[in-house]
Amino acid sequence: MQKGNIGVTTENIFPIIKKFLYSDHEIFLRELVSNAVDATQKLNTLASISEFKGELGDLTVHVSLGKDTITISDRGIGLTAEEIDKYINQIAFSGANDFLEKYKNDANAIIGHFGLGFYSAFMVSKKVEIITKSYKEGAQAVKWTCDGSPEFTLEEVEKADRGTDIVLYIDDDCKEFLEESRISALLKKYCSFLPVPIAFGKKKEWKDGKQVETAEDNVINDTIPLWTKKPSELSDEDYKKFYRELYPMSDEPLFWIHLNVDYPFHLTGILYFPKVKSNIDLNKNKIQLYCNQVYVTDSVEGIVPDFLTLLHGVLDSPDIPLNVSRSYLQSDSNVKKISTYISKKVSDRLQSIFKNDRAQFEEKWNDLKIFINYGMLTQEDFYDKAQKFALFTDTDGKYYTFEEYQTLIKDNQTDKDKNLIYLYANNKDEQFAYIEAAKNKGYNVLLMDGQLDVAMVSMLEQKLEKSRFTRVDSDVVDNLIVKEDKKSDVLEASKQEALSAAFKSQLPKMEKVEFNVMTQALGENGSPVMITQSEYMRRMKEMANIQAGMSFYGEMPDMFNLVLNSDHKLVKEVLADEEKECSAAIAPIQTELEDVTKRRDALKKKQEGKKDEDIPTVEKDELNDLDKKWDELKQQKDSIFAGYAGKNKVVRQLIDLALLQNNMLKGEALNNFVKRSIELI
């Protein structure tokens, strides 16, 4: 028996391995099964070039559980005592590297270029044994044992067949790995597509009301996964079946892209466009990254462009190591090339579907939209390509490319400053009246109700020359597209004041909601009262919900305009009745108010151009008193108008109709509206 110390520079290597080699201890199973697959593939390579002339036989890798042990067994090339000394005792040398160098033209399928992979066993084990016999003629089987210290033993043993058994004596604090369900889940996660059969226990079948083991190995992996095959050999059903295996609970994918590139990097895989039902779906299933069919991670940020991390599927590249780190991904040139390549393949595929089957593309647009919009918002190169196939949808359900839509609206939706005005709604039902008003003017209205449409609107205003997006409920229809300078409202100021004060007094108090009341001449057939919201302020608040650094806007109240149509019969009747009821009480207040205004204006004019210290205190006090008196008289007037409005059911009814149209009438206010409506009928 040989005893010795492992060739490391410090005796603290094992605690370091145990704690820091990999972030997840479960990785040990991936590493050891991958090593077993390596050894098997090496034997296949040697047989293919006639350096091994024996019988290959069954090459299945077996994983088995004992009371306190996990054993990984292969029938690969095995190791001699000298090879154990070189590859096991001298940490950081890897047999796969030497093997690749010697057989680089024939050994493309070797996984194990990871150096420290074997030592991951010590993350979960108090003792590890290697029982191995080389394929070489006359080789002596040996057993290597190490308890996690730098000391090891190496002795000759009897072993009938070539290959290697790795026996792990599991630590007391890692007993979870002795559970069949835990190992089964890890094998499914990491080894589902390894290129050599992996067996874990025996297949089971129902017999006499219970599950019993059969004699057949329970092979857990598909050795020739779909992405390794040629697209010409595959049917649509093959791709759909593979998707169902990857994501059993998901709907059928929209379509897929089969990737296969050999230069300047190696990459294969299949990416699927899933149906995204809600925000909850966005991170539920992720793209799986493999290295020569060994599962690496589902955190593919950096390898896949951000907007495509929403896709599903698999990527496989030997150019990305198993112990991949975020800093590696950010700096590696191959990774950047892969990301660019994937983005190009996706845009080419989308362009191809749009060009060859536009009907299918339009049918799937609502599902594709989030991917395409996300890409256009985050990647300039993708925007340049996607603008040719990205679509607008109008409220009638018709689809247009950007260019087609510009052609459609340029004659009728260009304002006096030569800006092209894109009208849009984000809820067909809630904004129905505004949409209909716009359509009655001959305008087309887009439906922009997607999760990213707020950001898209802002971006498109920057990208599309002399273009502006305006939501249909942001103003009265005549003001949405101003084609000529308008005459000012003909209603005199005192009448506007009376109307505004009456209606403002009856507006409901709502949390973080403010109203500005105004009058406009909108024609006899226009709505008597409308509620609009400034495009700018609404958009800023919407952006605050999705973009960091804009919380200021999110905290501001919602600002709405209550627009009174001075041409409408009902508004005229309210005004006439208000003047009749209030004129006697208002007249003396108005006379006094005009006198105060005249004196205040004269005093302000006298003080114009003077510094504050040059204005006599008496004048300052007088102006302050006049300001207070003006406010007091104004409040008296408003109180009289409010008293009138409180008794006039038509005022509150018109307000409630406008609120109801905007889905802003709820609870007690809605109940009162219904009662009042019955009384008025």
UniProtKB/Swiss-Prot annotation:
Subcellular location(s) per record: Cytoplasm
Region of interest (C), residue spans: 546-681
Keywords from the named record: ATP-binding, Chaperone, Cytoplasm, Nucleotide-binding, Stress response
InterPro entries: HATPase_C_sf, Heat_shock_protein_90_CS, HSP90_C, Hsp90_fam, Hsp90_N, Ribosomal_Su5_D2-typ_SF
GO cellular component, one term: cytoplasm
Keyword flag ATP-binding: yes
GO MF, one example: ATP-dependent protein folding chaperone
Location (main, coarse): cytoplasm
Residue span of region A: 1-326
Domain of life: Bacteria
Location of region: B: 327-545
Subunit and interaction comment: Homodimer.
Family: Belongs to the heat shock protein 90 family.
Function comment: Molecular chaperone. Has ATPase activity.
Protein name per the record: Chaperone protein htpG
Native source organism of the sequence: Bacteroides fragilis (strain YCH46)
Lineage: Bacteria, Pseudomonadati, Bacteroidota, Bacteroidia, Bacteroidales
